[in-house]
Amino acid sequence: MSDRLLACATYLSPNEHEAAILAGHSIDVSNGINMEDVAVVSQAFQARGVENLIITMGENGSIAAGKNGIHHTHCVKMEHVADPTAAGDSFVAAFCTGLTAGLPQGEALAFASHTAAITVSRMGAMPSLPTVEEVQQLLVERDYQGFDPAELDALKQ
């Protein structure tokens, strides 16, 4: 990707392998996520004009990095994984929706992770996408403490 194109991105959402290729530096996850590596990768993207980076890392969760610092959320594991189709799409859509609803980056990341978890537990693309109510229910069931799931009620209107 050219620097000119990257400079147009307010948010960029590569997976960990794409981020490593574009930044020229990988993130070590052998003993948990190496946050120093995350900072190096984030700075490489910021130097190329990307304001915010959302890195999906599979079972290692996801990271938001940029002008508001670095936030990590764990992968939300489901008892049954049926189909990964649309997981990335639902993750990015939920992250953007969370930001639009007024959630800070770290909380939008958690909302996105819970949304994608429901998505992978179902078959298909469109049929797997959860409603806000379903994500709120999962947040409550998993005793998520980052924000009150009722804050998402505004999305129902």
Give the residues covered by each predicted segment.
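Structural alpha-helical scaffold elements that stabilize or flank donor/cofactor-binding regions
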Residues: 2-5
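Short, structured coil segments at secondary-structure junctions
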Residues: 7-8, 49
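A short acidic, helix-capping loop that chelates divalent metal ions and anchors anionic groups
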Residues: 20-23
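Conserved phosphate-binding/catalytic region of the ribokinase-like
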Residues: 25, 30-157
